[in-house]
Amino acid sequence: MVKNQHYIPRFYLKNFAASDSMLSVIRIENGKPGSVFRCKPDGICSEKYLHEVKSRSEGAYFQEGAIEDMLSQVESRLAPKYEELLGCLDNGELIGTARLVELIDCLIAFIASLVVRHPKWLGPERKKASTLIPFLFEKETLTVSDLETLEVMGLKDDLPAIVEMAIMDAALFSTDERAPLMQIVDILKPMNVTFFAAPDNCEFIATSFPLHAEWMSTSDADPVAVYFPLSSQFAVAFRSCEPTGGKLVWPLIAEQVDSLNRCLVGGSDLNDLVFGTNGSYLASIISATAQHARKSID
């Protein structure tokens, strides 16, 4: 069983590393940024035994490593296609082809997965396990016969752990249309896709929740635009508007990249880490984001 379990896969993190394969990182605590530090992609966006559930009968954890193994299988399928997409953006191949559509579908699945596996989203869902048990009996999803079977197996005391594992399984892997994963996919899939390229000597940065969404009004359920940095060189926007025309990748100027980076950093309370290739640039973006927020309040 892996001790440090990532909520953002390493194959994504490494695309924001410098030429020496190291990330520059700033931690944000209580809204205040710390100092820049450097680390390998393995060293951030992870927690000890993040996807494990305490057991009363099977030792330390119930079915230890099960969720982490399933996530690793998902990542092993998505990672090559993610790298292929970045390669296509870099050299302009596959424009308008069925293969590109397939790669975008995989990208959407990956983005949806990042949302539901974030501990600040998944954690509260997992805590519902104990309170969910009476409801499951009421709906006869669980029965007295099930309890008797668990008792014979020596697992009766682990019913909360079993339900918590089921919650994670449904949230992270279910393709049922009612599942959180598929609800996010269904929002993104009809949207038009635009890719962006950063100019030389400029970079897209990422965060511990690398997603920025915008709504037309506070009463709307679904966003009208979603921004996601793909690497230090490329980013993507999903928008519920008319297509922008025949280009696959739109080159941006430095000011536009800065603006997108500020939107990402300031767009969510889930961002407790900001990372990229250049520590000084990260600090300047965080500072500019804070200044903009103060002006908005004033």
Language-model segment annotations:
Residues 1-4, 8-298:
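Alpha-helical structural context detector biased toward long hydrophobic helices
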